């Protein structure tokens, strides 16, 4: 977000990029609630903002970053369109300009239903704590593979009780899940090979 910097005592001599950026961020929080079907899971999260480097100067520009997560491609397209609309128009209203660098992440990971059912059955035969988790908005590059080749993405459940989840520096992994993960891959690889051999 590009404004015009000024001394903090004379904000009228500049165009405040911080005020404009916070207005954009605030407006983006309504993107889901007023544009997307409430039955659909869509998340808009602004996770990082940087502006200025001292206490008495209003900076020329500000940067913010975040992510939009959807399960539906139409929702993804609409969220992107509305993101551009909101960002550019709020910027214009505040007298600043906005430059958007949109990075396309992986699509949603869809497990192959037939393989999922097969692996659930096989894994349940040797492990008594197998569950089908709720859909997750977490992004995963594995989605690119299962778009081309039928596959299954599984969570092993390695996070210790009470420990923070993914991407937290103090996440604690349970060592006892390592053999469970090995068993999952080895047992199911043999089960799938046997299934393929039998046709």
Regions of interest found by a model, annotated:
Residues 16, 111-114, 173-176:
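Alpha-helix N-cap and loop-to-helix initiation/capping positions
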């Amino acid at each position: 977000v590009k404004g015009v910097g000024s001394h903090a005592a004379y904000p009228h001599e500049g165009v405040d990029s911080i005020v404009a950026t916070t207005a954009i961020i605030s407006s983006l929080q309504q993107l889901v609630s007023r544009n997307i079907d409430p039955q659909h899971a869509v998340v808009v999260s602004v996770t990082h903002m940087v502006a200025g480097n001292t206490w008495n100067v209003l900076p020329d520009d500000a940067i913010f970053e975040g992510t939009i997560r959807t399960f539906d491609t139409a929702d993804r397209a609409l969220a992107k369109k509305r993101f551009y609309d909101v960002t550019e128009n709020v910027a214009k209203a505040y007298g600043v300009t906005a430059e958007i660098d949109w990075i396309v992440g992986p699509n949603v990971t869809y497990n192959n239903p037939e393989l999922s059912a097969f692996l659930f059955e096989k894994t349940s035969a040797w492990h008594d704590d197998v569950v089908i988790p709720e859909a997750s908005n977490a992004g995963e590059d594995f989605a690119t593979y299962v778009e081309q080749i039928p596959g299954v993405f599984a969570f092993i459940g390695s996070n210790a009780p009470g420990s923070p989840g993914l991407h937290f520096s103090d996440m604690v992994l349970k060592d006892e899940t390592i053999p469970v993960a090995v068993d999952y891959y080895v047992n199911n690889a043999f089960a799938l090979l046997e299934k393929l051999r039998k046709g």
